[in-house]
């Protein structure tokens, strides 16, 4: 995020807060990161880490269903990081593409799903959901994508200029 110096970052799936802390480091001077976690116990753990960070004032933690929370956040997002329930990736993507700022990007994590999405016969609901997401994004004329094959795979997605 430091390369873009974003003002508004949305993270879908906080878990322990590690990604949020990394993303918050690159925020612009008055930037804000909104992170959404559905599991209260994970959100509580992340909140403890956030409180220890010098960027705590730039991070707002939301607890609940991202599909309900996203529409309540009135921002154009410079960066959206999706790392939540794999079966929800397509719906999250469809929710945030219209909310991207000019030049904004979506980063989707775990898009290789342990290499399972590369197998000829994909099994398991999460692997099938990630494969469907990858195909959905690949075939979306609104965006351009780059797949980074590091670790478990990240998909960088940018909304095309119209």
Give the location of each predicted region.
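S-adenosylmethionine/decaboxylated-SAM
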Residues: 1-162
